[in-house]
A protein has these predicted regions:
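Ligand-binding pockets and gating/stacking loops
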Residues: 1-285
Length: 285
């Protein structure tokens, strides 16, 4: 015989459960523990919060982009055949019609040149590592080296854009934005994706598209920590502005943004409000 109560419990979905649990004092605590899962299903009210719709395996990722580093041929990509072809002209089959850079366009010929540094095998994997990386060679078995990634870009900027977004043409989400989208955030008070840029000038240009969210929601855009002044914008109050005044200002902005969202329906309006609120919580913590 069917039990209608048990049938009802089996059909009870998560959202209905949270609504029902919220009626009791004990349910309030439980609803708080499960609120992040509910936020993952609907992030309109808290655009910066929530877990993804699946359980991520990684907890955090640190991505180091060494723009302008030495050639991989001098570090870990051992090419012994280059020595056998030393000073021979680069075969046309290698170039395959690829245009050359302005730095080499004036050359009369394009000779093959091997690395000037010695290579040796290291670790149980037998990975070839250059003498330039003695410390890296000691932990080579802990590293995963990919040699299959390539691009047709011959200049730094489009190649860097490709490395960070998977496309030479700007506008796609950066790798950090995809990670933020995939892993979510464990804290409402900290951004899920931050960017550290070098302080020194005169190096390769860095553009915000390298940590942009592209077509993903802007809550996944990287928060760039500045090397001068306030590391994060809006965390410090302007001179003469008290915390209470700041709170009043944010409340007024939230009301204006909410009115704009009701009229236009643009979710980025609420995301901007959430960004200001996060900065305020970082300031108050």
């Amino acid at each position: 015989m069917n039990d209608p109560i048990q049938d009802h419990l089996r059909l009870l979905n998560r959202r209905s459960f949270l609504s029902t649990a919220g009626l009791g004092v004990g349910g309030v605590a439980l609803a708080g523990l499960l609120s992040r899962e509910a936020q993952a299903a609907n992030t309109v009210h808290k655009p910066l919060a929530g877990y993804p719709h699946f359980a991520p395996k990684a907890k955090r990722i640190i991505y180091l982009h060494m723009n302008g580093a030495p050639s991989q041929l001098d570090l870990w990509d051992y090419k012994p055949q280059l020595e056998a072809h030393f000073d021979k002209d680069l075969p046309e089959s290698i170039r395959n019609g690829q245009r050359i850079t302005t730095m080499t366009s004036g050359q009369a010929r394009f000779p093959v040149a091997p690395s000037q540094f010695k290579f040796a095998q290291h670790g149980k994997s037998g990975r070839w590592i250059s003498e330039l990386l003695p410390h890296t060679a000691k932990v080579v078995d802990m590293l995963a080296v990919m040699k299959s990634v390539s691009t047709t870009a011959i200049n730094h900027d489009p190649a860097c854009t490709f490395a960070m977004t998977g496309n030479e043409i700007p506008g796609k989400p950066s790798i950090g934005s995809w990670i933020s989208y995939g892993l979510g955030s464990e804290s409402d008070d900290l951004p899920s994706f931050v960017v550290l840029t070098p302080k020194s000038a005169g190096g390769q240009a860095l553009f915000t598209r390298m940590w942009s969210s592209g077509f993903l929601p802007t809550r996944h855009t990287g928060v760039a920590l500045r090397s001068g002044g306030d590391p994060v914008l809006y965390v410090q109050n302007p001179p003469g502005v008290q915390p209470g005044d700041r709170r009043i200002t944010l409340d007024a902005l939230a009301q204006l943004n909410a009115a704009g969202h009701r009229e236009l329906g643009d979710p980025e309006t609420l995301t901007r409000t959430a960004q200001y609120e996060m900065a305020f919580r970082m300031q108050a913590s």
